[in-house]
Amino acid sequence: MNFIDEVKIYIKGGNGGNGCVSFHREKFIDRGGPDGGDGGRGGSVIFRSNHHLNTLVNYRYKQHFTAENGENGKGSNRSGKSGKSLVLDVPIGTQIFSEDGNILLHDFTEDDQSFEIIKGGSGGLGNSHFKTSVNQAPRKRTEGEIAEEMWIHLSLKLLSDVGLVGLPNAGKSTFLSVVTAAKPKIADYPFTTLVPHLGVVYVDDEEFVIADIPGLIEGAHQGHGLGDKFLKHIERCNVLIHLIDGSSNDVVVDYNTVRLELGSYSDHLEHKIEIICLNKCDVLTDEEIQEKINKLQQATNKEVFSISTYTNLGVNKIVKLALKIIKNQE
């Protein structure tokens, strides 16, 4: 399935039905009074979050959505049938913006939330409403209300507790596959991960969601590599796990490259709690591991953990630390 996280669509509510001009007809009654019914209300446009969805692909090819119009009123004071509302399902984490993207209209953060974005138009009044003492046979009625229409922007931000960051080939996808049941594509070349992946980590009868996004390279915020368009998917997380390839010639440069891209994208993202992990320690000697950890700790003034997603060295410790941070922020 294609991963689509940005779409622009047109939506319109249903118009109200027109009121009816009608007069009572009955045998032996020449001039019955007005009995025109009201028009039915138009259908509304409603968005609803659905945990079974994880992409906006349903809105990629069909972009125009209109609720049903209300029916016109009828004689014998019969009102027109109301139009059916249009319910559009979106993944949890979807945000609805104005067409220009500047105004946030709604943010879906839980399952089965509903948001009525456009109300259907009111039905018009039939001529029975306009009978007066001086006008016993009015031919006046009103038309149904024209419903609102608009273009909107849908943006999906995946909901996760932990975000994995690092350069391409830092081992993020392997980390995700080791600690969860997720099955991301893994190979020994850059940009194996082309779309975000989510997995659920189970720890001591508790769980949290972790997101792996495509690796960042220098200049990602300027569109280089796969760019920074996937960084929004870790904006909601509580903690970042920053994986660094231990086999790299300069782990400090690698670390700073990713930090620069995070800061260029968002101050909020740059200041999230971070767990720094020197990965692929299985291919290093103890002396090499300690040397690289010392360099990173001097450069960051933070604790650095040695792990190997190949042998599972230190991985469980990182998972438990992440869970502890998440619980402390609840």
Swiss-Prot record:
Cofactor requirement? Mg(2+)
Task: Provide the primary localization.
Answer: cytoplasm
Which parts of the sequence bind Mg(2+)?
173, 193
Q: Which UniProt keywords apply?
A: Cytoplasm, GTP-binding, Hydrolase, Magnesium, Metal-binding, Nucleotide-binding
Q: Name one GO cellular component term.
A: cytoplasm
The residues that the entry says bind GTP are 166-173, 191-195, 212-215, 279-282, 308-310
- CDD domains given in the database record: Obg
- Extract the PROSITE patterns matched here: G_OBG, GTP1_OBG, OBG
Taking the record's annotation, the residue ranges forming a coiled coil are: none
Q: Recorded GO terms, molecular function?
A: GTP binding; GTPase activity; magnesium ion binding
Q: Does the keyword Cytoplasm apply?
A: yes
UniProt domain OBG-type G: residue ranges: 160-327
Subunit description: Monomer.
Function statement: An essential GTPase which binds GTP, GDP and possibly (p)ppGpp with moderate affinity, with high nucleotide exchange rates and a fairly low GTP hydrolysis rate. Plays a role in control of the cell cycle, stress response, ribosome biogenesis and in those bacteria that undergo differentiation, in morphogenesis control.
Similarity comment: family membership:
Belongs to the TRAFAC class OBG-HflX-like GTPase superfamily. OBG GTPase family.
What's the protein here called?
A: GTPase Obg
Q: Which species is listed as the source?
A: Rickettsia akari (strain Hartford)
The top of its lineage is:
Bacteria, Pseudomonadati, Pseudomonadota, Alphaproteobacteria, Rickettsiales
